[in-house]
Amino acid sequence: MRRGERRGPAGPLGDGPALGLRRSTESEVYDDGTNTFFWRAHTLTVLFILTCALGYVTLLEETPQDTAYNTKRGIVASILVFLCFGVTQAKDGPFSRPHPAYWRFWLCVSVVYELFLIFILFQTVQDGRQFMKYIDPHLGVPLPERDYGGNCLIYDPGNESDPFHNIWDKLDGFVPAHFFGWYLKTLMIRDWWMCMIISVMFEFLEYSLEHQLPNFSECWWDHWIMDVILCNGLGIYCGMKTLSWLSLKTYKWQGLWNIPTYKGKMKRIVFQFTPYSWVKFEWKPASSLRRWLAVCGIIFVFLLAELNTFYLKFVLWMPPEHYLVLLRLVFFVNVGGVAMREIYDFMDDPKFHKKLGQQAWLVAAITATEFLIVVKYDPYTLTLSLPFYITQCWILGIILVLTWTAWRFFIRDITLRYKEIRRQKQEHKYEKDKCLSNGDGH
């Protein structure tokens, strides 16, 4: 039986002891409890292989007389040794599929990435940008000016050969990226309303900040039709359908070698990449002030992480198509799901989960550090004042949110409490008058 699982009448149940507290939102799991070679940590095996590799480099390989190459290789080797330690020794998170070591690996990558960000934060602006040349010699140069926005006509009568050329120009690689991105984000958040709010809010942020970053300047139909309705909306819809299937699925697991047929074995291998159990997230932001503030905080951090993607490219001089940008997105896809589960557990069962999970803590620290790098490297761009009408819209929105918060969690509660006290007093007075009238009758 693996760590983080609890044995029930039919085998291990769920991913932790909190199952009994969330019986209505977590699926039942049936497992024969088979603990095979695949599930072991293999600490001694990894240590032996690591020692042999280091011994080979030390005793048999001649060290090159290239200081820059040796420095890079030494840093990479140090990171690999840390990853080997973390994958075998770090604490398991809430997920166990496809393998706990997979999620331990991404936890350790989070630590490495945060340390890298801290290093960049403590450099001068020029040194930090030039340091990127050690990762890729093509980096460290200012980005070329690009034309964004432009002609926003859906049908351009001036172009007789292709009047819909503006639409075709927008159908690039970012369209499937938006779709799959929001499909995966929906699997992380597991709530239609939160996904739609984040999607729409980010488009408003692009409108508000296009005077700072030119690539935020898009046509209205690109914002609301291409992004919100088609790409994001379709990704959220498919994500919700997948969530519905996962919540209805029966989680019944059997050891690979206990399955008699080859077809059954292949099916079991494929399903190894599906969740071990499933928890339906019920955020309930209006149920209490604590949950409302927590959900608002989650949305804020989510939007900040999205903005960091664009601002980091801008201040560190990375072109949008660079592989480091893609690697960062892959990183957040893998750590985001774990972080959201840890946050939900922390909110939903604070008596058992007394502290925020390790992956959620690291994701919050990474998001904050990325933003601090943006602030340090280009404060001028960040301090460009918003247009007056944009400022008015945001002030109005903030006032509406604060007003609703005050009404829902303070004024409404006070009013309901006053009505309840008044009702109790009236009932008490009625009972008292009834007793007096009965006494007069006798």
Curated annotation (Swiss-Prot):
Q: Which residues lie on this side of the membrane: Cytoplasmic?
A: 1-40, 96-104, 313, 376-381
Supply the InterPro entries for this chain. Answer: PSS
Q: TM spans, by residue?
A: 41-61, 75-95, 105-125, 292-312, 314-334, 355-375, 382-402
Keywords of this protein's UniProt record, alphabetized? Endoplasmic reticulum, Glycoprotein, Lipid biosynthesis, Lipid metabolism, Membrane, Phospholipid biosynthesis, Phospholipid metabolism, Transferase, Transmembrane, Transmembrane helix
GO CC: one term?
Answer: endoplasmic reticulum membrane
* Record Pfam families: PSS (PF03034)
**Glycan attachment positions:** N159, N215
Q: Where in the cell is it found?
A: Endoplasmic reticulum membrane
Q: What is its main location?
A: endoplasmic reticulum
Q: Which reaction does it catalyse?
A: a 1,2-diacyl-sn-glycero-3-phosphoethanolamine + L-serine = a 1,2-diacyl-sn-glycero-3-phospho-L-serine + ethanolamine; 1-hexadecanoyl-2-(9Z-octadecenoyl)-sn-glycero-3-phosphoethanolamine + L-serine = 1-hexadecanoyl-2-(9Z-octadecenoyl)-sn-glycero-3-phospho-L-serine + ethanolamine; 1-hexadecanoyl-2-(4Z,7Z,10Z,13Z,16Z,19Z-docosahexaenoyl)-sn-glycero-3-phosphoethanolamine + L-serine = 1-hexadecanoyl-2-(4Z,7Z,10Z,13Z,16Z,19Z-docosahexaenoyl)-sn-glycero-3-phosphoserine + ethanolamine; 1-octadecanoyl-2-(5Z,8Z,11Z,14Z)-eicosatetraenoyl-sn-glycero-3-phosphoethanolamine + L-serine = 1-octadecanoyl-2-(5Z,8Z,11Z,14Z)-eicosatetraenoyl-sn-glycero-3-phosphoserine + ethanolamine
Which Enzyme Commission number(s) are listed?
2.7.8.29
**Where are the Lumenal topological domains?**
62-74, 126-291, 335-354, 403-442
Q: What is any one GO biological process for this UniProt entry?
A: phosphatidylserine biosynthetic process
**MF GO annotations:** L-serine-phosphatidylethanolamine phosphatidyltransferase activity
Q: How does it sit in the membrane?
A: Multi-pass membrane protein
The pathway where this protein functions is:
Phospholipid metabolism; phosphatidylserine biosynthesis
**Family (UniProt):** Belongs to the phosphatidyl serine synthase family.
Q: What does this protein do?
A: Catalyzes a base-exchange reaction in which the polar head group of phosphatidylethanolamine (PE) or phosphatidylcholine (PC) is replaced by L-serine. Catalyzes the conversion of phosphatatidylethanolamine and does not act on phosphatidylcholine. Can utilize both phosphatidylethanolamine (PE) plasmalogen and diacyl PE as substrate and the latter is six times better utilized, indicating the importance of an ester linkage at the sn-1 position.
Q: What is this protein called?
A: Phosphatidylserine synthase 2
